[in-house]
Amino acid sequence: MRWEVEDNKYVIDEVWENYGSKHKSFGGWYISGEISRATKGAIGAFHTMGKQCKDVSGGLPTFISPWIDGKKAIMGTSKKVNDNAVTVDQHEKEWNEIFDGIHDVVDACAFQDGHIDYDELDAFFTVNKKLADRYGMQCWTNAESFDRDMPINFLPIKFDKLRMKLEAAKRAGYDKAITFEFSHFMSPQSAYLQAGHLYDRYKEYFGMK
Protein backbone atom coordinates (compact mmCIF):
# COMPACT_ATOMS: atom_id res chain seq x y z
CA MET A 1 0.00 0.00 0.00
CA ARG A 2 3.04 2.27 -0.20
CA TRP A 3 1.94 3.92 -3.45
CA GLU A 4 -1.50 4.64 -2.00
CA VAL A 5 0.08 6.41 0.95
CA GLU A 6 2.40 8.46 -1.25
CA ASP A 7 -0.40 9.52 -3.61
CA ASN A 8 -2.74 10.44 -0.78
CA LYS A 9 -0.19 12.70 0.88
CA TYR A 10 -0.80 15.20 -1.91
CA VAL A 11 -4.55 14.61 -1.98
CA ILE A 12 -4.93 15.24 1.76
CA ASP A 13 -2.97 18.49 1.58
CA GLU A 14 -4.91 19.66 -1.48
CA VAL A 15 -8.30 18.82 0.02
CA TRP A 16 -7.49 20.67 3.23
CA GLU A 17 -6.09 23.71 1.43
CA ASN A 18 -8.99 24.04 -1.02
CA TYR A 19 -11.91 22.96 1.14
CA GLY A 20 -11.21 22.05 4.74
CA SER A 21 -9.45 25.26 5.70
CA LYS A 22 -12.16 27.40 4.06
CA HIS A 23 -15.49 25.78 4.91
CA LYS A 24 -16.99 25.13 8.32
CA SER A 25 -19.05 22.32 6.79
CA PHE A 26 -15.86 20.26 6.41
CA GLY A 27 -16.31 18.04 9.45
CA GLY A 28 -13.80 15.23 9.03
CA TRP A 29 -12.11 12.70 6.80
CA TYR A 30 -12.94 9.45 5.03
CA ILE A 31 -9.77 7.44 4.46
CA SER A 32 -10.94 5.65 1.33
CA GLY A 33 -8.59 2.68 1.11
CA GLU A 34 -10.57 -0.54 1.48
CA ILE A 35 -9.30 -3.76 3.04
CA SER A 36 -10.94 -6.79 4.60
CA ARG A 37 -8.10 -8.73 6.20
CA ALA A 38 -4.74 -8.05 7.79
CA THR A 39 -3.24 -6.95 4.47
CA LYS A 40 0.51 -6.45 4.54
CA GLY A 41 1.29 -2.80 5.17
CA ALA A 42 -2.32 -1.84 5.91
CA ILE A 43 -1.80 -0.82 9.53
CA GLY A 44 1.10 1.46 8.69
CA ALA A 45 -0.73 2.92 5.69
CA PHE A 46 -3.90 3.77 7.58
CA HIS A 47 -1.91 5.15 10.49
CA THR A 48 0.16 7.39 8.22
CA MET A 49 -2.87 8.73 6.36
CA GLY A 50 -4.95 9.12 9.51
CA LYS A 51 -2.18 11.01 11.27
CA GLN A 52 -1.70 13.37 8.33
CA CYS A 53 -5.45 14.07 8.18
CA LYS A 54 -5.49 14.94 11.86
CA ASP A 55 -2.27 16.94 11.77
CA VAL A 56 -3.35 19.24 8.94
CA SER A 57 -6.89 19.75 10.27
CA GLY A 58 -6.28 20.20 13.96
CA GLY A 59 -7.61 16.80 14.92
CA LEU A 60 -10.82 16.49 12.89
CA PRO A 61 -12.30 12.96 13.06
CA THR A 62 -11.43 10.23 10.59
CA PHE A 63 -13.13 7.02 9.55
CA ILE A 64 -12.55 3.97 7.38
CA SER A 65 -15.03 1.61 5.70
CA PRO A 66 -13.56 -1.88 5.22
CA TRP A 67 -15.39 -4.92 3.92
CA ILE A 68 -15.73 -8.31 5.57
CA ASP A 69 -14.21 -11.22 3.62
CA GLY A 70 -17.44 -13.22 3.77
CA LYS A 71 -19.33 -15.64 1.57
CA LYS A 72 -20.37 -12.93 -0.88
CA ALA A 73 -16.88 -11.48 -1.36
CA ILE A 74 -16.53 -12.75 -4.92
CA MET A 75 -15.89 -9.61 -6.99
CA GLY A 76 -13.22 -10.18 -9.61
CA THR A 77 -13.81 -13.94 -9.64
CA SER A 78 -16.12 -16.33 -11.46
CA LYS A 79 -17.27 -17.90 -8.20
CA LYS A 80 -20.81 -17.83 -6.87
CA VAL A 81 -19.67 -18.14 -3.24
CA ASN A 82 -16.36 -17.40 -1.53
CA ASP A 83 -15.31 -20.83 -0.27
CA ASN A 84 -12.47 -19.28 1.73
CA ALA A 85 -14.68 -16.88 3.67
CA VAL A 86 -13.26 -15.59 6.92
CA THR A 87 -14.61 -17.05 10.15
CA VAL A 88 -15.91 -14.84 12.93
CA ASP A 89 -12.97 -15.83 15.15
CA GLN A 90 -10.37 -15.06 12.49
CA HIS A 91 -12.09 -11.77 11.66
CA GLU A 92 -11.93 -10.81 15.33
CA LYS A 93 -8.26 -11.75 15.59
CA GLU A 94 -7.19 -9.81 12.51
CA TRP A 95 -9.24 -6.69 13.24
CA ASN A 96 -8.09 -6.65 16.85
CA GLU A 97 -4.56 -6.34 15.49
CA ILE A 98 -5.57 -3.64 12.99
CA PHE A 99 -7.51 -1.55 15.51
CA ASP A 100 -4.65 -1.83 17.98
CA GLY A 101 -2.39 -0.20 15.40
CA ILE A 102 -4.67 2.59 14.16
CA HIS A 103 -7.08 3.59 16.94
CA ASP A 104 -5.10 6.70 17.89
CA VAL A 105 -5.63 8.24 14.43
CA VAL A 106 -8.85 6.58 13.20
CA ASP A 107 -11.99 7.51 15.14
CA ALA A 108 -14.64 5.32 13.53
CA CYS A 109 -14.95 2.16 11.47
CA ALA A 110 -17.96 1.60 9.19
CA PHE A 111 -17.82 -2.04 8.12
CA GLN A 112 -19.61 -2.71 4.82
CA ASP A 113 -22.46 -5.13 5.53
CA GLY A 114 -23.03 -6.79 2.16
CA HIS A 115 -20.38 -9.50 1.97
CA ILE A 116 -21.77 -11.73 4.73
CA ASP A 117 -25.02 -13.68 4.81
CA TYR A 118 -28.04 -12.52 6.75
CA ASP A 119 -27.76 -15.29 9.35
CA GLU A 120 -24.21 -14.12 10.09
CA LEU A 121 -25.00 -10.46 10.74
CA ASP A 122 -25.38 -10.71 14.51
CA ALA A 123 -22.17 -12.68 15.03
CA PHE A 124 -19.97 -10.36 12.97
CA PHE A 125 -21.66 -7.17 14.16
CA THR A 126 -21.24 -8.15 17.81
CA VAL A 127 -17.52 -8.68 17.27
CA ASN A 128 -17.16 -5.39 15.40
CA LYS A 129 -18.81 -3.44 18.20
CA LYS A 130 -16.79 -5.22 20.88
CA LEU A 131 -13.52 -4.40 19.13
CA ALA A 132 -14.48 -0.77 18.52
CA ASP A 133 -15.40 -0.34 22.19
CA ARG A 134 -12.14 -1.95 23.27
CA TYR A 135 -10.13 0.65 21.39
CA GLY A 136 -12.33 3.68 22.00
CA MET A 137 -13.56 3.88 18.42
CA GLN A 138 -17.06 4.44 17.08
CA CYS A 139 -18.66 1.50 15.29
CA TRP A 140 -20.81 2.38 12.28
CA THR A 141 -22.50 0.22 9.70
CA ASN A 142 -22.15 0.90 5.99
CA ALA A 143 -25.52 -0.48 4.89
CA GLU A 144 -25.28 -1.44 1.24
CA SER A 145 -28.46 -0.34 -0.52
CA PHE A 146 -27.82 -2.58 -3.52
CA ASP A 147 -28.47 -6.32 -3.76
CA ARG A 148 -25.61 -8.80 -4.05
CA ASP A 149 -28.00 -11.77 -4.30
CA MET A 150 -29.29 -11.01 -7.79
CA PRO A 151 -27.83 -12.30 -11.09
CA ILE A 152 -27.50 -8.68 -12.26
CA ASN A 153 -24.83 -6.44 -10.72
CA PHE A 154 -26.41 -4.39 -9.19
CA LEU A 155 -30.04 -3.55 -8.44
CA PRO A 156 -31.54 -1.65 -5.49
CA ILE A 157 -31.97 -3.95 -2.52
CA LYS A 158 -35.36 -5.15 -1.28
CA PHE A 159 -36.34 -3.12 1.77
CA ASP A 160 -36.84 -6.22 3.93
CA LYS A 161 -33.15 -7.05 3.44
CA LEU A 162 -32.02 -3.52 4.22
CA ARG A 163 -34.23 -3.54 7.32
CA MET A 164 -32.70 -6.82 8.52
CA LYS A 165 -29.22 -5.32 8.27
CA LEU A 166 -30.15 -2.08 10.02
CA GLU A 167 -31.94 -3.95 12.82
CA ALA A 168 -28.89 -6.18 13.32
CA ALA A 169 -26.72 -3.08 13.65
CA LYS A 170 -29.15 -1.68 16.22
CA ARG A 171 -29.08 -4.93 18.23
CA ALA A 172 -25.29 -4.81 18.29
CA GLY A 173 -25.36 -1.25 19.62
CA TYR A 174 -23.77 0.41 16.60
CA ASP A 175 -23.29 4.18 16.84
CA LYS A 176 -24.36 5.25 13.35
CA ALA A 177 -25.52 4.01 9.95
CA ILE A 178 -24.40 5.27 6.56
CA THR A 179 -25.18 3.79 3.16
CA PHE A 180 -23.53 2.99 -0.12
CA GLU A 181 -24.88 4.08 -2.40
CA PHE A 182 -27.81 6.48 -2.06
CA SER A 183 -27.76 8.32 -5.39
CA HIS A 184 -27.94 5.17 -7.54
CA PHE A 185 -29.90 2.74 -5.40
CA MET A 186 -32.11 4.76 -3.04
CA SER A 187 -32.69 8.21 -4.47
CA PRO A 188 -36.07 9.15 -5.98
CA GLN A 189 -34.03 10.76 -8.78
CA SER A 190 -32.24 7.51 -9.66
CA ALA A 191 -32.68 5.93 -13.08
CA TYR A 192 -33.76 2.79 -11.20
CA LEU A 193 -37.50 2.95 -10.56
CA GLN A 194 -36.98 0.60 -7.59
CA ALA A 195 -34.71 3.14 -5.89
CA GLY A 196 -37.52 5.61 -5.31
CA HIS A 197 -39.73 2.84 -3.93
CA LEU A 198 -36.92 1.76 -1.58
CA TYR A 199 -36.69 5.32 -0.32
CA ASP A 200 -40.45 5.40 0.25
CA ARG A 201 -40.33 2.16 2.27
CA TYR A 202 -37.40 3.53 4.29
CA LYS A 203 -39.34 6.68 5.14
CA GLU A 204 -42.42 4.68 6.09
CA TYR A 205 -40.41 2.44 8.40
CA PHE A 206 -38.84 5.35 10.26
CA GLY A 207 -41.98 7.50 10.25
CA MET A 208 -40.47 10.19 8.04
CA LYS A 209 -42.54 12.49 5.84
Spans of features found by a protein language model:
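Glycan-processing catalytic domains of CAZymes
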Residues: M1-K209
